[in-house]
């Protein structure tokens, strides 16, 4: 279960959404200009289940 969510933006303009869970893990989504990167970090600090998807918002379809 999600305990809380933190949203922030770094100095380069990359937006982050971090979802913290009651088991000590967190799920992070990074919104870069041309791709989105999702991954889970366990309570031990291991990075799991990385997903890299292109960002199609900037394309004219």
Summary of predicted features, one role per range:
Residues 6-60:
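Acidic, low-complexity, intrinsically disordered interaction modules
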